[in-house]
C-alpha cells in the first residue's frame, strides 16, 4: 500500500481509503490459498484534452489472478535477451508503477521464443535500466547491485525487500 500511496501523491491523485481497499482485497482473495491481486487506481472520468474533473472521483479496479506456478527459471538464472526498444526517461514518473508502460510492451513484442524469459532494456544513453517486467539485481560477493531508478524504471516491492536484506 505504501507504493500505491507514493504513486498517488506523485500523480496528484487522492489517496485511497486503505482500510476499505484492504477489506476489499481480503474479500476478493477469500477461499484462495495463494493469489495475486492487482489494484488499479485511476483519476476517474476525464474531460477532453486530459483535463481532470473537479472534484476528482477516482475509480478503483481490483483484479484477482492465479499465483504463478514455479518454473525452472524461478531458480535462476533467467535466459535473457537485449531489447532494441529503449526506455523513455522521465524523472517525474520514475520509480512508480503507472499504466504508461508502452516502452515495455514494445520491447516484449520483439520476441516470441519461449526459451527467453526476459528482455533487458537500456536507457537512451545505453545504460542498463531494467527488464521488460522486472527489476535487475546482480549479486557480487555480499553486495547487491541494481541500476539507478532516478530517471526510469519501477522501484519494485521485491527489489526493495532484497536491498533492505542486503544492508
Predicted segments with their positions:
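Helix-start/capping segments and mature chain N-termini
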Residues: 1-19, 23-31, 36, 42, ...
Amino acid at each position: 500500500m505504501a507504493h500505491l500511496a507514493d504513486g498517488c501523491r506523485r500523480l496528484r491523485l487522492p489517496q485511497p481509503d486503505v482500510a476499505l481497499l484492504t477489506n476489499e482485497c481480503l474479500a476478493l482473495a477469500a477461499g484462495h490459498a495463494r493469489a495475486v491481486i492487482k489494484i488499479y487506481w485511476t483519476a476517474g472520468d476525464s474531460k477532453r484534452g486530459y483535463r481532470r474533473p473537479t472534484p476528482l472521483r477516482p475509480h478503483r479496479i481490483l483484479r484477482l489472478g492465479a499465483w504463478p506456478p514455479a518454473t525452472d527459471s524461478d531458480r535462476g538464472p533467467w535466459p535473457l535477451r537485449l531489447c532494441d526498444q529503449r526506455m523513455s526517461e522521465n524523472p517525474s514518473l520514475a520509480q512508480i508503477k503507472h499504466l504508461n508502460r508502452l516502452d515495455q510492451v514494445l520491447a516484449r513484442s520483439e520476441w516470441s521464443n519461449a526459451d527467453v524469459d526476459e528482455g533487458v532494456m537500456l536507457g537512451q544513453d545505453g545504460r542498463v535500466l531494467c527488464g521488460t517486467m522486472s527489476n535487475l539485481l546482480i549479486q557480487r560477493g555480499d553486495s547487491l547491485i541494481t541500476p539507478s531508478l532516478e530517471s526510469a524504471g519501477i522501484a519494485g516491492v521485491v527489489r526493495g525487500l532484497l536491498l533492505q536484506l542486503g544492508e
